Structure formats: structure tokens, C-alpha cells
């Protein structure tokens, strides 16, 4: 038998030892062989994600606020407060020695309060986008403590985990925004001897994950069951931002300060001056939130507390036109894509903003008002190629008067 045929006879995988006859393919190299089965095995190993060492952005407070300014009009104090709080939070994570000289840095969770549509949720969303970290929103009113019908607090962590594509390390540095936090207040500031399923009990349930714990998260959500497998998530470095309207909080602050907040109009109705209200809310203390019905331990987990003021007419007009993704800019771009130039008069913008104020939902109402205003045009424009320009006037907003339309080779009339 020749040397060449002997070599072929004895050829086998250098990794598993299988002979050429036992495999489909045997790939040869200089004095080495690998079979198709080992190639597939190696490919599978390489395809597996290595443990995440997710690196997040860490921006200085001024840099964070500058980016928030691009999308959020007004709320200067809230933006500064949250910028400092977020910077300190992520600086704490980045620090290699969190307990230098025996000093332990606490979490900088943030509590935002203010009326509906004042920008609380938008601030949190924009922040997550700026920092490029996983983000999720939860509604506090759907949460119940363990053992009651409703949503477990661990499901909030699950949604963050899903936003991070189940990358645990990435989720552990994400942001969770819990809205309507004021709706889980105690009905009285005194400790109740009865069980408060959706109030104090939920605050107690949230305490651990907010301050930092190893949460056992059901991978498919729902209630926990014995013998169920869990994903362990450390919440120590998750930034929690909570928000709520905290209606009439200014009255609690005024009482503490010995001031009167209420006036009366000609019809003997209560009137609260917006400037006075804003000034009072800027003087909020943890004890005011406790008096409102939040438990002391929960309030104590939030080092940064900021007020989002009620938006006034000039604010709403600016929100329509100024931010990077302003609603008016979006509609102008949509019409431009159809070859139509869309314009609004200043009076029209003011009328839209005034309708939002009357709706009582702040900036949230702006998009709906615009959608209703522009719906018929958005329906007709794609089928009418003769239109070149559209001008929206105040009367179009307030009286449903048709807008001024210019067609190709025609003047606006």
C-alpha cells in the first residue's frame, strides 16, 4: 500500500477523532483536519452572544440639557434638575470605586410632577434617546402588590428587558418611567390598618426595585408560579423616573407656608393664579408629597424632585413650531412630499394653541387638533395634483372655513 493511500485511510478529524467515513465532509489543512460536524459546532459557539459589556454614553449636565432643549420647550428647572440627576446616576455607575473612603453614593432617581401634557413623559423618553439606553413606560394605576389581581411590579422590569432584546446587562443600565405615580397615594397621610391594594401596598412593592434589588422576572410575564424559571435582573443601576399630576399639591404647600392660594371670580368660582401656583410648586418639600399620600420610604428614594409647570399659550405655540420634531414641521414635510407647500398664519397657530388649553390636556391635545384640522386635506391632496400651496388661517381653525388654496399657474385668492 502506498504512503499516499495510507494517509487517506488514517485521515480523521483533529478535534473529535471521527474518521473520514464517519462524517460528510473532512476539511484538510497543513497536518490537520476538521469535520463538518465540528465546523457547525464552532459556528454555533461563535454565534452565541458574548456576555454584554454594554457601554452607555455619559454626558455632562449642560450637554444633556442642550439636547433636551432641542425637543422640549420650557420647563427649564425640570430639565436642569433631571440633567444633574441623570449625570450623577450614570457617573455613579461608571465609577470603579463607588465606596471610596467609605462613602457610598446613593441612586439619583427622579420624581417629576405637573399637570397632564406638561412634558413629563416626553422628558423621560427624550432622555433615554439621548443616552441610547433601553427605556420603558409603566402605568402605576395597573400595578398591584403580590397576591392580588393586577400586574406585578416585576413585569415593569420584564418590559425593560424586552426593550433591551433580553440583554440583561444592557437592561440593568436602562431607564424606567412610571406614570400616574400620584394615583397610588394613600387616601390619608395616616397609616391605615386595612390593606390598600392599589395604593400604599404598591408603593411598598415598588420600594425594593427602585432602591436596588435582584428581581426575579418571569420571562413571559404574568404572575409568578412555583418551580417557574426566572431571569435575574439587578435593578441597582436602573434609573427610575416617576411622574404624576399631584392635583392640588400647591394647596398642601401653601398650608405649610401659611399662604392662601385661592381667589374668586365674579361668579364666586375658585381661581388660582398660574404664576402663584408655579411659585408655590417650586417650593415643594418631601413632607408635602408625604402629606399628599406618598409613604416616606418611597419619597426618600427620589433625590431629585422637579416641577413641570402648566404650559401657557406662548409655550404651546412654540411647541407647535420650534422643536426638531415639531408637529407643524411634520405636517409641512408630509405635504412637501406630495409637492404642496403648506403654511400657517400666526393667528392660526395661536388658535390651535388656545384650543389645546381649552381641552385641558396641554401639549397632548395639539396633535389631535392638527389631525382633525388637516384630515380632509390629507385625504384630497394625494389625488389632486393641481394644488401647489395651502394657507391655513385662523378662521380655518375656529370656524372650519376652507383654507386658501393655490393651484399651479394660479395666484392665491
From Swiss-Prot:
The keyword Metal-binding applies. ATP binds at residues 115-122. Pfam families: AAA_2 (PF07724), ClpB_D2-small (PF10431), zf-C4_ClpX (PF06689). Residues 1-54 form the ClpX-type ZB domain. GO terms for biological process: cell division; proteolysis involved in protein catabolic process. Zn(2+) binds at residues 13, 16, 35, 38. GO terms for cellular component: HslUV protease complex. InterPro entries: AAA+_ATPase, ATP-dep_Clp_protease_ClpX, ATPase_AAA_core, Clp_ATPase_C, Clp_protease_ATP-bd_su_ClpX, ClpX_bact, P-loop_NTPase, Znf_CppX_C4. The keyword ATP-binding applies. GO terms for molecular function: ATP binding; ATP hydrolysis activity; ATP-dependent protein folding chaperone; protein dimerization activity; unfolded protein binding; zinc ion binding. Keywords: ATP-binding, Chaperone, Metal-binding, Nucleotide-binding, Zinc. PROSITE patterns: CLPX_ZB. ATP-dependent specificity component of the Clp protease. It directs the protease to specific substrates. Can perform chaperone functions in the absence of ClpP. NCBIfam families: clpX (TIGR00382), PRK05342.1 (NF003745). Belongs to the ClpX chaperone family. Component of the ClpX-ClpP complex. Forms a hexameric ring that, in the presence of ATP, binds to fourteen ClpP subunits assembled into a disk-like structure with a central cavity, resembling the structure of eukaryotic proteasomes. This is ATP-dependent Clp protease ATP-binding subunit ClpX. The gene is clpX.
Amino acid at each position: 500500500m502506498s504512503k499516499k493511500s495510507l494517509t487517506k485511510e488514517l485521515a480523521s478529524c483533529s478535534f473529535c477523532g471521527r474518521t473520514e467515513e464517519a462524517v460528510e465532509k473532512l476539511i484538510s489543512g497543513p497536518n490537520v483536519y476538521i469535520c463538518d460536524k465540528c465546523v457547525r459546532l464552532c459556528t454555533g459557539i461563535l454565534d452565541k452572544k458574548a456576555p454584554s459589556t454594554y457601554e452607555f454614553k455619559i454626558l455632562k449636565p449642560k450637554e444633556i440639557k442642550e439636547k433636551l432643549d432641542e425637543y422640549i420647550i420650557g420647563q427649564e428647572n425640570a430639565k436642569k434638575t433631571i440633567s444633574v440627576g441623570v449625570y450623577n446616576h450614570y457617573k455613579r455607575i461608571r465609577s470603579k470605586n463607588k465606596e471610596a473612603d467609605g462613602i457610598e453614593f446613593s441612586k439619583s432617581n427622579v420624581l417629576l410632577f405637573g399637570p397632564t401634557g406638561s412634558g413629563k413623559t416626553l422628558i423621560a423618553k427624550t432622555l433615554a434617546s439621548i443616552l441610547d439606553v433601553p427605556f420603558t413606560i409603566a402605568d402605576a394605576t395597573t400595578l398591584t402588590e403580590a397576591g392580588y389581581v393586577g400586574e406585578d411590579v416585576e413585569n415593569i422590569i420584564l418590559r425593560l428587558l424586552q426593550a433591551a432584546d433580553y440583554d440583561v446587562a444592557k437592561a440593568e443600565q436602562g431607564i424606567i418611567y412610571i406614570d400616574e405615580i400620584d394615583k397610588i397615594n394613600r387616601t390619608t397621610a395616616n397609616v391605615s390598618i386595612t390593606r390598600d391594594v392599589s395604593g400604599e401596598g404598591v408603593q411598598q412593592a415598588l420600594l425594593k426595585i427602585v432602591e436596588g434589588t435582584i428581581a426575579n422576572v418571569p420571562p413571559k410575564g404574568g404572575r409568578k408560579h412555583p418551580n417557574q424559571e426566572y431571569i435575574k435582573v439587578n435593578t441597582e443601576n436602573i434609573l427610575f423616573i416617576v411622574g404624576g399630576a399631584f392635583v392640588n399639591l400647591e394647596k398642601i404647600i401653601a398650608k405649610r407656608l401659611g399662604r392662601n392660594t385661592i381667589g374668586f371670580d365674579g361668579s364666586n368660582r375658585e381661581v388660582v393664579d398660574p404664576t402663584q401656583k408655579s411659585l408655590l410648586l417650586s417650593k415643594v418639600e418631601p413632607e408635602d408629597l408625604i402629606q399628599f399620600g406618598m409613604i416616606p420610604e418611597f419619597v426618600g428614594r427620589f433625590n431629585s424632585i422637579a416641577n413641570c409647570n402648566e404650559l401657557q399659550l406662548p409655550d404651546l405655540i412654540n411647541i407647535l413650531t420650534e422643536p426638531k420634531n415639531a408637529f407643524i414641521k411634520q405636517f409641512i414635510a408630509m405635504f412637501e412630499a406630495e409637492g404642496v407647500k403648506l403654511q400657517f398664519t400666526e393667528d392660526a397657530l395661536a388658535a390651535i394653541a388656545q384650543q389645546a388649553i381649552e381641552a385641558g390636556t396641554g401639549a397632548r391635545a395639539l396633535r389631535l387638533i392638527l389631525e382633525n384640522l388637516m384630515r380632509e386635506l390629507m385625504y384630497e391632496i394625494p389625488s389632486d395634483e393641481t394644488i401647489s400651496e395651502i394657507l391655513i388661517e385662523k378662521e380655518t381653525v375656529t370656524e372650519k372655513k376652507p383654507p386658501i388654496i393655490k393651484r399651479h399657474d394660479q395666484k392665491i385668492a
